[in-house]
């Protein structure tokens, strides 16, 4: 895995995966799409979609644990703070040889810079929330969210997927 290349690719994902508008009905549709995809693949994950301050969709699939819910919360907090994907922030910290606690004073008990939370961006409004998955390895959590967003927005996932490691 090339961190610089992944960071560039994640930036392209964040630029491309923008909703023209977003409301609770769209959150429900996206959440159900993610639930169906995870169920078909046998993923034991938690799925969370929020606008900042308002939960819109949550599901814990068979095999997910309360620990996944806490990972969701901590990854979601990273997106809320930085307005970037949690994986991008984690890779930046890895590249810098630093932690969120060291560099930004953010406690790891509340912020997790691991893959799986992605900014919910609306054209003309910016980042308004996050879409999060937890239960797979961090890169797979990130890509699961990106794949679902591509399907929801009619984008070609193959063109936006991270390089295979």
Swiss-Prot record:
UniProt superkingdom: Bacteria
Transmembrane segments: none
Pfam families assigned: HbpS-like
Database matches in Gene3D superfamilies: Haem-degrading domain (3.30.450.150)
NCBIfam families cross-referenced by the UniProt entry: PRK02487.1-4, PRK02487.1-5
Similarity-based family: Belongs to the UPF0303 family.
UniProt cross-references to PANTHER family, sorted A to Z: PTHR28255, UPF0303 PROTEIN YBR137W
Protein name per its UniProtKB record: UPF0303 protein BamMC406_1480
Natural source organism: Burkholderia ambifaria (strain MC40-6)
């Amino acid at each position: 895995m090339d961190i610089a290349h992944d960071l560039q690719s994640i930036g392209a994902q964040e630029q491309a995966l923008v909703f023209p508008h977003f409301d609770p009905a769209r959150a429900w549709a996206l959440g159900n799409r993610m639930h169906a995809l995870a169920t078909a693949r046998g993923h034991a994950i938690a799925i969370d979609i929020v606008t900042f301050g308002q939960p819109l969709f949550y599901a814990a699939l068979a095999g997910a644990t309360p620990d996944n819910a806490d990972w969701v919360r901590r990854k979601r907090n990273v997106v809320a703070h930085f307005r970037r994907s949690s994986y991008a922030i984690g890779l930046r910290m890895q590249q810098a040889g630093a932690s969120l606690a060291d560099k930004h004073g953010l406690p790891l008990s509340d912020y997790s810079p691991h893959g799986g939370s992605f900014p919910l961006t609306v054209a003309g409004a910016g980042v308004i929330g996050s879409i999060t998955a937890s239960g797979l390895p961090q890169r797979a959590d990130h890509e699961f969210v990106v794949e679902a967003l591509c399907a929801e927005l009619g984008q070609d996932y193959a063109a936006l997927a991270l390089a295979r490691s």
